[in-house]
């Protein structure tokens, strides 16, 4: 792994460091990104190593927060997310903050954190992630009807698939199941599966895909019929959607 394996925007944040230090920190961050799915604990160790050498860099604190969240250290994730927010001035990890408050057993506080943000200023994908996290906090409080209301957002379009659609559809399915509306829950879970398969097909056809690219795919009737519980979606028409930035519920 070399410093070049780290994405460009993150490398740019390291320019205030000495050349040798920037190289070392970049390698740790690149390793954290590479390992987070397969070995989150080791990814977290690399993030902590980067933090020891570059604790005032926003992307470093963000990486510590994300890896801490992944291993279930929600208290550390919260501290690091607050620091990241203060350094960067960004709210793009607000959904993770809400979920981390849930993780430490404070769903009421999670709702306060989510409500304090002007959602109209957020990128679309972040807005969707926040809605999912807020819905989860409502479930934690036993407010199932209000959990469903949190997901009633303009982005909930059953006929089109964006990059955020599978998670949003699946979240709605889970809440409907909690409400005992099993038939509706199954329909939304099916839509989630169709959307995920369609997006997966498009990704497979693309040589490269920017991490912050938002893709829109029309979900036609044939695609939904083709995706039986044991089959794969075969038909989807890909279109471009509005730009957005990439952030978990």
Give the label of every model feature segment.
Residues 14-20, 48-55, 82-89, 116-124, ...:
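Solenoid-like repeat scaffolds
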Residues 16-45, 49-52, 63:
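Alpha-helical segment of the N-proximal tetratricopeptide repeat
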Residues 21-27, 43, 54-61, 88-96, ...:
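Generic helix N-cap/helix-start motif at coil->alpha-helix transitions
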Residues 31, 63-64, 97, 134, ...:
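Structural register within alpha-helical repeat arrays
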Residues 36-38, 71, 104, 141, ...:
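Structural motif corresponding to the intra-repeat A-B loop/turn of tetratricopeptide repeats
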Residues 87-90, 119-120, 144-157, 169-170, ...:
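TPR/TPR-like (Sel1-like) alpha-helical repeat modules
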Residues 177-235:
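Intrinsically disordered, low-complexity mixed-charge segments
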């Amino acid at each position: 792994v070399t410093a070049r394996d780290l994405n460009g925007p993150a490398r740019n944040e390291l320019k205030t460091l000495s050349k040798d230090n920037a190289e070392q920190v970049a390698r740790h961050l690149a390793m954290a990104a590479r390992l987070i799915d397969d070995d989150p604990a080791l990814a977290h160790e690399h993030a902590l190593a980067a933090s020891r050498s570059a604790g005032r860099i926003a992307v470093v604190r963000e990486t510590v927060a994300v890896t801490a969240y992944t291993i279930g250290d929600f208290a550390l994730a919260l501290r690091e997310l607050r620091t990241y927010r203060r350094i960067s001035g960004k709210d793009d990890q607000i959904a993770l903050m809400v979920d981390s408050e849930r993780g430490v057993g404070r769903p009421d506080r999670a709702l306060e954190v989510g409500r304090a943000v002007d959602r109209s200023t957020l990128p679309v994908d972040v807005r969707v992630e926040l809605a999912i996290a807020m819905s989860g906090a409502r479930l934690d409080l036993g407010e199932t009807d209000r959990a469903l209301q949190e997901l009633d957002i303009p982005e909930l379009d059953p006929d089109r698939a964006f990059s955020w659609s599978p998670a949003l559809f699946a979240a709605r399915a889970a809440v409907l199941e909690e409400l005992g509306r099993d038939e509706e829950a199954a329909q939304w879970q099916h839509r989630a599966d169709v959307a995920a398969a369609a997006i997966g097909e498009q990704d497979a056809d693309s040589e490269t895909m920017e991490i912050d690219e938002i893709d829109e795919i029309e979900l036609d009737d044939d695609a939904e019929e083709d995706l039986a519980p044991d089959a794969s979606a075969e038909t989807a028409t890909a279109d471009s959607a509005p730009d957005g930035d990439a952030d978990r519920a």
